[in-house]
Regions:
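Bacterial Sec-dependent N-terminal signal peptides
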Residues: 1-26
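Glycan-recognition and catalytic cores of secretory/periplasmic carbohydrate-active enzymes
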Residues: 24-394
């Protein structure tokens, strides 16, 4: 080939790549500006009056708030930390710290597994971003609290207690949900901070048992696996928030994708990366055209059913992470498509609407009639995380 033609192709390729980067930057910048407007409004409402409140969703024209011990309580503080990371505006860090420290008592909570979400997304981000020394002890105490839920005979962290609420009606003994993969990160970090390998060993045991028992041959994940806590025997495989026991609940697949990629990052164990990539292939093969999944991949009324923006946001963040690990371009392309769709008027709220939340059209738990087709604080959290991960890619 003529040298001049080769040089021409190289120049064109470089220009196209540069334009793509500029387009990427514009998408991030546009979303940050939108988030600034929305979250400023939501922040003001959360701090109105004498009581600091934790916004979770917006329904029937009203923002709804949750108590500190709700599983979603850490996401708003984490969202504020992400806004600081995206803007370098100290105002966001100041408010993030206030909302984080409201959750101080959660480090002692032992009656469910979601303390990883609650504390690591708040105190964990604060420690990572601002290196606030006292946050280290909060994380270690939380890791100890979470570790009390480890059932040695089964080798897993029990997700829910079964002595109260709707969980008591299911006949479970030691239910483990795929979501629990997301709570292992705080254990991995606790070992790094303390040198105590107990946390690491618990996290690996749980991940290995999940790898062994949660997945179907097509790499889709069950939502719930119930164990005998003494023997480790699998008693049931079923769902709580999906369409059916054998269906693929979208957010469950998102947790699996994200959780195993994260476990690989902390351990270097190839089996975790392989599982995350198997889940990735399953998801990519079943996504609708715009990349935003329906609430369950097997919902019987597709396409006339709800999308779940929260699942797309979690998946987008996880796909960027997988791309940074493997360099597989399909992962970046999938994440880019998801972010592009979530940034469109179909899913991103206009400034001044949606109660101050960024994204519309998420689904909490359709079987429970809870938070259907509404904004959710964790959708916004993972959306901003995906923007951060995208902005850091070369």
């Amino acid at each position: 080939m003529n040298i001049s033609i080769i040089n021409y192709i190289a120049v064109v390729t470089a220009v196209v790549s540069q334009l793509a980067c500029h387009k990427s930057d514009r998408l991030v910048e546009d979303n940050v500006e939108n988030a600034r407007v929305q979250l400023s409004s939501l922040l003001a409402l959360s701090e109105e009056g004498d009581t600091l409140r934790i916004p979770s969703t917006f329904k029937a024209g009203e923002v709804e708030f949750v108590p500190e011990d709700d599983w979603v309580s850490g996401f708003f503080a984490g969202t504020l930390w992400y806004m600081y990371e995206l803007t370098a505006d100290e105002m966001w860090a100041d408010h993030a710290r206030v909302h984080t420290e409201k959750l101080d008592s959660i480090q002692y909570l032992t009656w469910h597994h979601d303390v990883g979400f609650m504390v690591f997304d708040s105190f964990g981000n604060g420690l990572r971003i601002k290196n606030i020394p006292e946050y280290r002890d909060k994380i270690l105490t939380t890791a100890h609290s979470l570790s009390t839920r480890f059932r040695t005979g089964a080798g897993v962290l029990q997700s829910w207690n079964v002595d109260r609420g709707w969980q008591a009606e299911r006949g479970w003994k030691c239910p483990v949900i795929i979501d629990n993969m997301m709570n292992l990160e705080i254990l991995f970090n606790a070992t790094r901070m303390s040198g105590d390998s107990t946390f690491f060993k618990i996290a690996v045991s749980h991940a290995d048992r999940t790898l062994e028992n949660h997945f179907r041959p097509d790499a889709s994940s069950y939502h719930v696996v119930d164990y005998d806590p003494e023997t480790g025997e699998v008693l049931h495989r079923c769902t709580a928030q999906g369409y059916a026991d054998e269906s693929a609940w979208a957010r469950g697949q998102a947790w699996a994708l994200y959780g195993f990629a994260t476990a690989y990052s902390y351990t270097g164990f190839e089996r975790y990366l392989e599982q995350s990539e198997k889940v990735a292939a399953y998801i990519i093969g079943r996504l609708p055209e715009d990349g935003v999944p329906y609430w369950d991949f097997d919902a019987p009324d597709i396409p006339d059913t709800y999308r779940d923006a929260s699942s797309a946001a979690i998946m987008a963040s996880a796909f960027y992470h997988l791309y940074s690990i493997t360099g597989t371009i399909q992962y970046r392309q999938t994440a880019d498509k998801m972010l592009s769709s979530l940034s469109s008027p179909a899913y991103r709220a206009e400034p001044g609407t949606n109660g101050g939340f960024i994204l519309m059209h998420s689904v909490g738990s359709l079987p429970h009639g809870s938070n259907i087709d509404v904004p959710l604080n964790y959708a916004d959290y993972y959306f901003l995380e995906a923007l951060i991960r995208r902005s850091k890619l070369k």
